[in-house]
UniProtKB/Swiss-Prot annotation:
DNA-dependent RNA polymerase catalyzes the transcription of DNA into RNA using the four ribonucleoside triphosphates as substrates. It holds the Pfam family RNA_pol_A_CTD. Its EC number is 2.7.7.6. One of its GO terms (biological process) is DNA-templated transcription. Belongs to the RNA polymerase alpha chain family. SMART domains: RPOLD. It is an enzyme of class 2 (transferase). This is DNA-directed RNA polymerase subunit alpha.
Amino acid sequence: MAILNFQKPDKVIMIDSTDFEGKFEFRPLEPGYGLTVGNALRRVLLSSLEGFAITSVRIEGVDHEFSTIAGVVEDVTEIILNLKQVRFKRQIDEIDNESVTISVSGEEQLTAGHFQKFISGFQVLNPDQVICHMDKKVSLNMEITIEKGRGYVPAEENKKANAPLGTIFVDSIYTPIKNVKYSIENFRVEQKTDYEKLVFEIISDGSIHPKDALTEAAKTLIHHFMLFSDERITLEADEIAQTETYDEESLHMRQLLKTKLVDMDLSVRALNCLKAAEVDTLGDLVSYNKNDLMKFRNFGKKSLTELEELVSNKGLNFGMDLSKYKLDKD
């Protein structure tokens, strides 16, 4: 029996495009596929794209988020709400996070634009975003940390062990997409009029072009749907769930990451700093990024250089995601 061909587009038409807004047309689609494709893409666009946001702030003279600052109109809670709205675009590809100290005085208003001269790896996309209003006599000093992430992450999940006293962790809105709308219209192919046209409108914060955002969302869906291909469908799921299996490379990596740092040729100073921070194994060490290490008590650049050499020689990197090695399962 002959297999009926699906009507599907051979390309996506970009109707309008700027750095912030894009309108795209996708046609023809079989009846019902407008909703299927449109809803899936919209969900991924709004929840699963990477972006950059402030994850923590430390303000001089402030112990907690319910404090007030003399000479500043807004309380700390309001300042944090305003910091959450600041949008960033990465300027240097190698940088995923940055901690910066911001000092402002002689101003009646602190805006996100004041941050730019203190930040090297990121561009502030909404410099007019007001952070707080202040007396000109006030000198305001704060340290913010910018990190890469996906979607929305609550402050509780941003918390880090051994953070400096007075660090306030912030809800992070990483998603670079501000709004997504789609509509479905009838489309005619020859004599048939019940095919569909999918029209997509994407508004971004400027850190990613709408066209690139649509491409990334589609790739994410493709990677997930590939799991349903014939070679990935198996009857061994129950057995795998009962007995964890690892390939040779993963087993080697697990053993390496569980290596005690006291067994490494490290200086006494570096070992003492790490021990005080409860960093005992290579896995503990590489789970931190360099900025986090520099916040350890008595930890200096000489110790960082020593650890960078160790980590590099072992073929590892700082800030690694170790979840796939399941180090907590022995």
